[in-house]
């Protein structure tokens, strides 16, 4: 899969999202926005995280999920169940996690503003993504 950085990019977002088998694939990175698609296996999760200066939009294309959010890492308590066609807007600074509660892969796409990942980022698994993020944050 090739990323289409800073060029007009027309796509079937539902097909791109459902056909993605990687934990995370960056499809497009612009000056102020980034598009990624994710496939989260049954029983797995994105992982509790916060983007200090990045707003995030998530949309579920397939599967079922539980969204958990909170103002601090210790106070994550607000929950919502997500089904296909549900979208979530997560303001910068909000702790959040998306947990796959279904029996099949959860397929979501995400818009970050500004970009959260390096252009062209592909993480085949959550473990690969966690290791890369630990390196980025000097935790490895």
For each predicted feature, which ranges?
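Short acidic-glycine-tyrosine-enriched beta hairpin
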Residues: 72-91
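Short hydrophobic/aromatic-rich beta-strand segments that constitute the beta-sheet cores
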Residues: 37, 67-69, 108
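A short, N-terminal "cap"/entry segment at the start of jelly-roll beta-barrel domains
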Residues: 1-34, 47, 80-83, 124-140
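A short hydrophobic beta-strand segment most commonly corresponding to one strand
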Residues: 57, 103-120
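Short beta-strand His + acidic residue motifs that chelate non-heme Fe in jelly-roll/DSBH
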Residues: 46-48, 67-68, 90, 96-102
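Conserved short histidine dyad/triad with adjacent acidic residue
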Residues: 21, 37-52
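A generic "binding-loop/recognition-motif" signal
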Residues: 33, 42, 53, 94-95, ...
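Glycine- and acidic-residue-biased ligand/ion/polar-headgroup-sensing regions
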Residues: 53-71
